[in-house]
Regions:
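Non-heme di-metal
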Residues: 1-172
Length: 172
């Protein structure tokens, strides 16, 4: 969510900015859904259940408070996402992020048989596919506004002359 929200400020055209805004807003609801699932799974655990589940190291640091970290226990950091200010770079990375999220949901579904977890995860997985497609549309929009023979000749968010004819001049 934060990645897309920050990228929207330099995104052009406005349609791409709108896509980034819409998806960043929806991704916040994904965080809420995952947090609700985690809370429901951990609420009321006994010390014995915590130890049995291998959850004791987490419990020592956070009790049952939700703390953003990977499945391996690596804490979340803003270094996980990027905003380069180049829409081709950013949208390509966004598409990869959506595919990684989908793969993570696939792995959760392989390991989980609880329908109260599986059903919302299936929903989130489908939304990641839609986001991937929307970012693909946004990337095509950016590329359509550029010189079709060389998308990489300039940065459309920075170079004011970046357009269909911009790459006829040599880059310095």
């Amino acid at each position: 969510s934060l990645r897309y929200m920050h990228q929207r400020y330099t995104a052009k055209p406005d349609k791409v900015k709108g896509i980034l805004t819409d998806i960043s807003t929806e991704e916040l609801s994904h965080v809420e859904m995952i947090s609700a699932i985690l809370y429901q799974l951990t609420d009321g655990l006994t010390p014995e259940q915590i130890k049995e589940a291998g959850f004791d190291a987490y419990f020592v640091d956070h009790t049952l408070g939700l703390y953003p970290q990977s499945a391996a226990g690596v804490p979340f950091t803003a270094a996980y996402f990027q905003s380069k200010g180049d829409p081709i770079t950013d949208l390509t990375e966004d598409m990869a992020a959506e595919q990684k999220a989908r793969s993570t949901y696939d792995n959760i579904l392989r390991l989980c048989d609880d329908p109260d977890v599986r059903d919302p995860i299936k929903f989130l997985r489908q939304r990641e596919i839609v986001h991937f497609q929307r970012f693909g549309e946004a990337l095509r929009q950016v590329q359509d506004d550029l010189n079709s023979k060389n998308f990489y000749c300039c940065n459309p968010s920075f170079d004011s002359s970046c357009g269909k004819t911009a790459c006829r001049r040599k880059m310095r």
